[in-house]
């Protein structure tokens, strides 16, 4: 029972880290990254479709994204989706491809992005702590199943060690992203 709870804690905490990395990858850092467009969906033949399923997204230059749709009819839908997004990018449509030039970040914009990064990191830490609380509750409920106090205490210590490990990993991910944003 305890091993299952520890395994569940590890899986959930790992998923939180994966979600954090995915969220941070989509944040603008002054250089082109196809992951910036992961959250954007365009209306294509009546359904919302992710941009990476509508065409090829490449990075020909450090601050340029190039979107080559497989169907030229999707160009205007892709352009509208990018304009409606919160990225603040202006697409340039030449009839065959869409170019997105990533503007240089001002100092103020960088600081705002860093604030958002820190907030996202805090949310991930809260999620990790919530997982810890749920797992500790599960362990405490094992008292009813004649599990010894020593085993329960050891399991709680193991859960705390996992929590500390994942919180430390979040801190390193966040500080790396901050350096990336501030050093451009």
Curated annotation (Swiss-Prot):
This is Ribosome-recycling factor. It comes from the Bacteria. The keyword Ion transport does not apply. One of its GO terms (cellular component) is cytoplasm. The keyword Cytoplasm applies. GO terms for biological process: translation; translational termination. Pfam families: RRF (PF01765). PANTHER family: MITOCHONDRIAL RIBOSOME RECYCLING FACTOR PSEUDO 1, RIBOSOME RECYCLING FACTOR. HAMAP family: RRF (MF_00040). Keywords: Cytoplasm, Protein biosynthesis. Coiled coil: none annotated. GO terms for molecular function: ribosomal large subunit binding. Belongs to the RRF family. SUPFAM superfamilies: Ribosome recycling factor, RRF. It is found in: Cytoplasm. Responsible for the release of ribosomes from messenger RNA at the termination of protein biosynthesis. May increase the efficiency of translation by recycling ribosomes from one round of translation to another.
